[in-house]
Amino acid sequence: MSPPTENFYADWRSRFGLANALRDENHPPPERLLQAIWRHQRLQRDRLQTADGRSVRVLHPGFVSVEGGPDFRGAVIQIGDAAPRSGDVEIDLRAGGWRAHGHDRNPEFKNVLLHVVWDDVGVHALASAKLPAQLGSACPTHRRTIPQREIELQPPPPTLVIGDKLDAPIAELGLWLENDPPRDLPEKLRGQCCVALRELDEKRQGKILDAAARVRFQAKAEQFRARARHAGWEQALWEGLFRALGYKHNVWPMQNLAELRPRWLRGADPAFALQARLLGLSGLLPAELPRTQAGGDGYLRRVWDCWWRERNEFSDCTLPRAVWKFHGLRPANHPQRRLALAAHWLADKKLISKIENWSVAEISDGRAALPRGQVPQCGISPAKLVDSLRKILEVERDEFWSWHWTFRSARLKKPQPLLGDARVTDLVVNVILPWLWTRAAEGKNEKLQRAIEHRYAVWPQAEDNSILKLARQRLLGVGRSRALRSASAQQGLIQITRDFCEHSNAVCDNCRFPELVRGWSTG
């Protein structure tokens, strides 16, 4: 291999790439690099001061936000002689970005403690700026009226300029980011329980996760039992299924629709009629039909023809479109498509019986289901377990939604399933198994309860998400862990964060979990 000095690509990169650009003092670094510098605190931390001269002590830089708003959430910062506070941090290139980007008019930025910037361009204008004195003053960026409470909650936060406070030249930090992207949290930013948990072997870690997972599972089961007392077992299950189809963005609109199921289900048996009714009730139908005839417009016209005849009957319970959130949604998770899937489930009058039969079916070797009430005794293949439930829940083919993400999207080249393995796992862990378990408990069928618990324990891990990633890094100090090979172990990790992390701050003040782990491991 040629020496590095003879590497022509290295020469190109040095002369014309990011490193070269960062040598230009008039060329600000990319904001992504500033975010990495802040996250890993590549700063001369003892020299940090706000633009007005107050000292800044960063007890924790916060966690990267994945859902818009400020760049970092949950930071713990002490400014001057004040007590440390928890809040958000926003990163911008220029101090003037606070107003230029509309942060001062955005309620999502009301908890920002510190505005971290590369240079002080605009900082004096920001300091002298006054909030609008007149109520109802227009906000040109968002073209809406600003309520007084929003204006009062969002004065400019203290500004911290870091361009001259780095712990290494900016070009060197640029190479650090490009060549060795830091994926795990630095040791000092992990939770205080991380050391205690990492001292345990995989088996003992698994025991803690399993115990937490059982707590979470039983809490979900209790929720179904409580709802069934008022609405019945079948209605409780449908509400759970709809909630799960809403994911984190649209849980409540889906729940609202499901609660009204006894009213709108009557007289709409075929899947298409149910699709039209659900899409109409949801408020997600386009307000106007297109003038030109495109590929999917025939389906939309048929839906409107169906909904037009009955919309007055349901006008008092039709949801406004504004209750739905679309930002950050994957196309496959669009609520229009999820409601189409729910319509197919509702059209299958035997769906609940199929789910109940599945709970006692022999799955590991593909044999037929056992007589109702009997529980299989042999081991279960996790892969076949997922496949067996997917066959019950999946839709073979939908004339429109197998080929489109939304009403307005182009026709796909290949049909896409309305339900994948990742969503099956969400449904089984959060809805189906807890519902089946609590029904078995009500019937005092302990044998069936144990079988359902076993399926929960062996179900393959769920799709990764930002909550799990952060929890792994904070509690286990790793991007991946062999202890998290099942969906139930993931649920256990989430439960620990709910029970302990969410009741403390980023520096783990007054958190008893590390002490409890150490006591348990030595007991």
Task: Spell out what each predicted region is.
Residues F16-R57:
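Short Lys/Arg-enriched alpha/beta "domain-start" segment
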Residues L476-G523:
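Acidic, carboxylate-rich catalytic segments that either coordinate divalent cations
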Residues D71-V123:
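A broadly used, surface-exposed interaction patch
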Residues H115-A138, H142-G280:
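Internal, well-ordered alpha/beta segment that forms a basic, Gly-enriched binding/recognition surface
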Residues D210-G492:
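Hydrophobic, aromatic-lined core segments that form the binding pocket/scaffold
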Residues M1-F16:
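Intrinsically disordered, low-structural-confidence terminal and linker regions
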Residues V56-F72, V76-G80:
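Active-site metal-binding core of divalent-cation-utilizing nuclease and nuclease-like domains
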Residues P70, P84, F109, A236, ...:
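Short, well-structured alpha-helical interface segments that form or flank functional binding sites
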